[in-house]
């Protein structure tokens, strides 16, 4: 299968995915005892940051640029986790599935999630504005400056995202 081939070709990334998804499961298991959106998003944030850390090596991208890329990846992972939680809120409630934005304290956590999402968008934009892109800069800029906020606004209004 494609997953087995990828795991064989990239064992470090496979180990990262397995480790972070296990951490995500553990974080979700204790969430309602210690509700922290920072803690619940950390494993997925680490997964995306780690994925970008393994981006092809390029001398021009080393040192501070790679650190910035990893940081932006972590913020994007946090954003993806929270936007998915907001988007799936009703469906998760209907099916009795875990969602960090439901239950007691849910409305306050939803407001906090929206604040974190907007903050993450700003931080991703700030980091990407400092990175030296040699191609596709306008596409990335549109995704970061227009796409992410547009998705957040749609989900905030209750519009369900279409599956890809």
Predicted regions and their residues:
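C-terminal domain/tail detector
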Residues: 128-160
């Amino acid at each position: 299968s494609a997953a087995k081939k990828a795991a064989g070709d990239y064992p470090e990334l496979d180990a990262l995915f397995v480790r972070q998804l296990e951490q995500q499961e553990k974080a979700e298991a204790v969430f309602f005892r210690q509700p922290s959106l920072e803690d619940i998003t950390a494993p997925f944030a680490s997964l995306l940051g780690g994925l970008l850390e393994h981006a092809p090596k390029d001398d021009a991208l080393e040192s501070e640029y790679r650190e910035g890329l990893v940081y932006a990846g972590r913020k994007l992972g946090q954003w993806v986790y929270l936007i998915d939680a907001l988007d799936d809120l009703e469906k998760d409630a209907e099916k009795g599935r875990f969602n960090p934005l439901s239950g007691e304290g849910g409305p306050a956590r939803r407001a906090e999630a929206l604040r974190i999402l907007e903050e993450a968008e700003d931080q991703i934009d700030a980091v990407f504005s400092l990175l030296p892109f040699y191609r596709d800069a306008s596409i990335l800029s549109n995704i970061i400056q227009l796409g992410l906020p547009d998705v957040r606004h749609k989900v905030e209004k209750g519009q369900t995202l279409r599956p890809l």
